[in-house]
From Swiss-Prot:
Biased segments, Polar residues type: 29-47
Residues covered by region (Disordered): 1-47
GO CC terms of this entry: endospore-forming forespore
InterPro entries registered for this protein in UniProt: SASP_SspN
One annotated GO biological process: asexual sporulation
Major localization listed first in the record, in broad terms: other
Induction: Expressed only in the forespore compartment of sporulating cells.
Keyword annotations: Sporulation
Source organism (scientific name): Geobacillus thermodenitrificans (strain NG80-2)
Family that this chain belongs to: Belongs to the SspN family.
Subcellular localization(s) per the UniProt record: Spore core
Protein name: Small, acid-soluble spore protein N
Length: 47
């Protein structure tokens, strides 16, 4: 039997721009596509 916790769209192509990203509980959805801007790097240790 399959694991019911895994969503069926886990195996869908996840390239930036192929799927609409909605802001939800998962912060990763917000961090993926920022419409052409550079990735925001947050340094946690050292400098």
């Amino acid at each position: 039997m399959s694991n019911p916790k895994r969503s069926p769209n886990h195996f869908a192509p996840n390239h930036i721009g192929t799927q609409p990203r909605a802001a939800g509980g998962n912060k990763g959805k917000q961090m993926q596509d920022q419409s052409g801007q550079h990735a925001q790097v947050i340094q946690t240790k050292g400098e």
